[in-house]
Every structure is written in structure tokens, then in C-alpha cells.
Amino acid sequence: MNKEIFTSSLLDEQYTKYRHPSGLDIYIFPKKLTTFYAIFGVKFGAIDNCFSLKENPENIITVPDGVAHFLEHKLFANEDGSDSFERFSSLGADANAYTSFNNTAYLFSATENFYDSLRELIRFVTHPYFTEENIASEIGIIAEEINMYNDSPSDRCFYGMLEGMYEHHSIRRNICGTAKSIKKITPELMYNCYDSFYNLNNMGLFICGDVHEDEVIKIADELLPSKSTQFDIIHQSNNKKEEPQVFQTYIEARMQISKPIFNIGIKDTNIPDNSDERQKREAIYSILNEMIFSQAGELYSSLFERDLISPNLSYCYTISPTNAYNSIAGEADNPKSVLDEILKFIEDLKIKGLAYDDFIRSKRIMYADFVKSFDSTEGIANNLMSFSFDGAEILSYVDIIESITFDDVDTVFANAFDKDKITLSVIMPLDNN
């Protein structure tokens, strides 16, 4: 079994990566904290709705929206009629799962019985059980979940931003799918997706806590195959076929809210192929956002003091191999005026130039936030999965942050915030008339 140790003298942290004979990568991050945390992740998310197999690349398979999320729900069902949530609960562990655009994760946290809980995690994720009956019963449950998200102003506003930015990319579709799309899901389809994507070469096990590595590997040897099977997926989609400009510049809906909310999306099509370069771009944008949009900054003070925005203004840059965007979200009586004020501030700032002191302050904040994330087993395990699934190495991120210069940020800023790459998504209150 291949073993690789990663260390950081800056962070004084270390973890080990094992390449199990089954093809599964096992990451063990030792941490002497009271909580254990484990994630069994798979690189299968909501955007993976179109693919083919290497043995027949011309046969393109398209699956209904929401399949990855539906599969996540049903994997907890066992052939003996039990539910794995109940098994975790009996062990004193808190289990959960989630589906994102790019990945699916099955996880638990525990303060006791860690190894028994780990056995249950590996066992149920590697033993699917789908029937006509349990699929039919789940359709109604997920339809209610879809309705709940559709009734959420913040979710509607977020997806409106994505729909405005992207014309073709699967990210514009709801992770849960639609009430119509999930009705097309069958046991055969679920098994086909499971067999295609839930290959151990396409998965990872991420563990953080005060654990014994030998015991973890012993459990993996007990429950996993001794040989690897070939991973045959070829992604076939329109996810890279996007124009630089946004699809629509303005999206509006009306819902039962007291004050308008908004999401501003800035599309970024300059996506590096190299994972380290993607991580660096994410770090640069995070520093830039802190310089421009933080509560300590001139822009926020101006907007808030003139009552143009409510106190909470959030901002985030997101990047993956197939899409990237910057987003700013908040609450305002007139979101269009807020966007105009932001663009005017950006235009003036490009003439005046970024302040070096703001760069130093923002970089220190980002560095401190990253270091602080290593105080939590949950934060470590989730970040470990995120970095690893993107082909990056978590401990090297601190070196990436350290390496970023003022010129790096200034260069990105010079080409950011183009008007034709901006979408404004707004949820307005219902018209009283």
C-alpha cells in the first residue's frame, strides 16, 4: 500500500495519505481534539448529468437533474429494512450527507465509538439498495424539499444569479432537480449512476481526530476489495461551452418578503487548468474581496451610512475546473442603485489604484482565517476533501497565500468587474396592488 506524508512547518501540521489496493485514497489527519470527524466523498455532483463510458465514448448518457442528490438520500436505506441514520445514532454518532454541484459527501462526527461508526460509514456507502418501492416513496419527500427551496427567497435569489450568468452550464439547475425530473428516476438508473461514479478510484475517505492509523487501515482492509477496478467515466457536457459575457444581466422574482434582497454575480471565465493555479486565483480574489467589500472598507461604510444596504453584506469567490464567479449578496431597498454605486466605486478605484495597506490587512485576515480552520476536525476534514478532490494539497495553501503579492491582486483587479460579465438577481416584495 502506497503511503505519503504531508507536512507544513509554517502550520506545524501533518497528515498521511494512503492509496488502498481497492483504489480508494484514505487521508488521515491526526488531531488531539475531543471530536472525531470522517467523510466518505465521491466526485459525483449535480453538474454530472451527462457522461459516457470509455468502452463506448460515442454513447452519451444523459440523466435527469437531481440524480446525485436523490442517490445520496437513498444510500442510507439498507436491505434489511434498517436505516443507517439509526445505526449511527445507536453508536452515539451524528451522521449527515450533502450533495454539492461537484461532489457528494457522507459524514459523521463522534466523541466515542469512532471505529464502529467508521465501519458503518464504509459499509453503507459501498452497499447500495434501490427498489421500486423505496424510490417511489422518496420522490414525494424530495418533491417537498424542492418546494421548500423554491419557497426560500435566498435560494431563489442565488439560483437566479446562476441562471443569469450561465446559459448552458449545469450549475444553473437546482441541485435537487425539479418535481418533474425526479419522477424519471428508477432503480435501474440509480444503479447505473452508482456503478459508474461510485468507483473507489473516484472517491476519498477523509478522517480527522485522535485516531490510530493502523486501526483505520485494518477496517478498510476488512470492508474494501483487495483489487482496484478501472474508472471508466468520460464527462460529456456543455459545462465548458460558455460565452465570456453573462446570459442575462437582470433577473427578478417577487415573493413574500418585507425588503428586497439581491445577489450580484460576476462571471469569471479565466479558469486555470492547473489546480494550484486555481487555488491561487481563489486566494487572490478572496484578498481582493476583503479589500473592497469588508465592513472596514470605504465602500461598505458609504453604502451603509447612506442606508443603501442593510448591515449584512456577504461576498465570496467560487472556482472549480468548469466554472468560476464572484458574488456579493445583501438586502437593499433599491438593489439596482447598490450595483450602480459598486460599479462607480470600482471605476474610481481603478483610476486611483488599490491601497497597499488594504492589501496587507486583507492578506493577514485571510492567513489567520485559514490557520484558525485547523482548530476544528470538521473544518479540517471538509477542507481536506475540497482541496484533494480539486487535485490540490491543503497544507501547501498557506504557502500559496504567503506567495501572493500586491501586483498579483492588482493584475486580477484590472480585468475584474466588467459590466458584460455581471448579473443582478433580485427578489422583490409582492406588489400590494
Each PLM stretch: what is its role?
Residues 1-83, 191-302, 423-433:
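His/Glu-rich zincin catalytic helix
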